[in-house]
Amino acid sequence: MSRRNAAEKRPILPDPQFNSRLATMMVVRLMQHGKKSTAQRILSDAFGLINERTGGDPLELFETAVKNATPLVEVRARRVGGATYQVPMEVRQERGTAMALRWLVSFSRARNGRSMAQKLAGELMDAANEAGNAVRKREETHKMAEANKAFAHYRY
């Protein structure tokens, strides 16, 4: 690994269809084998289904879903004197959003049958209503951090 200089962080451009940076991030995480147009179609179809079912703005629901699935704390392994402790640490905003999107996509893929757009729409609507596996994963992460609060002084 190079010790010279860290890679420059590229700005995330807003999605051309929805004019949202969050939508661009979601497309990138939905994409498989470099098929960006397919990922964009999946997100667009999912938003269409959300609009059909709720009648509200799908972009607002999407943002709410991501906010509800975003963890605030997580545990990280830290070795101290031969023992490994699960140390609770706060999650930076960018990392939290990335984790939420990753969970939303993975739990959408794990859902049964139907098209990916339908599975994604279902997971997003569940997350917006504080239900669904992505929100459950967030609660689980918070519980782990709470249980290991005693090791918080090992923070680095």
Swiss-Prot record:
Q: Name one GO cellular component term.
A: small ribosomal subunit
Query: Is this entry keyworded Cytoplasm?
Result: no
GO MF: rRNA binding; structural constituent of ribosome; tRNA binding
Q: Supply the alphabetized keyword list.
A: Ribonucleoprotein, Ribosomal protein, RNA-binding, rRNA-binding, tRNA-binding
The UniProt entry's GO biological process terms, in alphabetical order, are: translation
InterPro entries linked: Ribosomal_uS7, Ribosomal_uS7_bac/org-type, Ribosomal_uS7_CS, Ribosomal_uS7_dom, Ribosomal_uS7_dom_sf
List membrane-spanning regions: none
The record's annotation in NCBIfam families points to: rpsG_bact
PANTHER family, per this entry?
Answer: RIBOSOMAL PROTEIN S7
Function per UniProt: One of the primary rRNA binding proteins, it binds directly to 16S rRNA where it nucleates assembly of the head domain of the 30S subunit. Is located at the subunit interface close to the decoding center, probably blocks exit of the E-site tRNA.
The UniProt entry's sequence similarity note says: Belongs to the universal ribosomal protein uS7 family.
Subunit structure, interactors included: Part of the 30S ribosomal subunit. Contacts proteins S9 and S11.
Tell me which HAMAP family the record gives. Answer: Ribosomal_uS7_B
- Name recorded for this polypeptide: Small ribosomal subunit protein uS7
Gene name linked to the record? rpsG
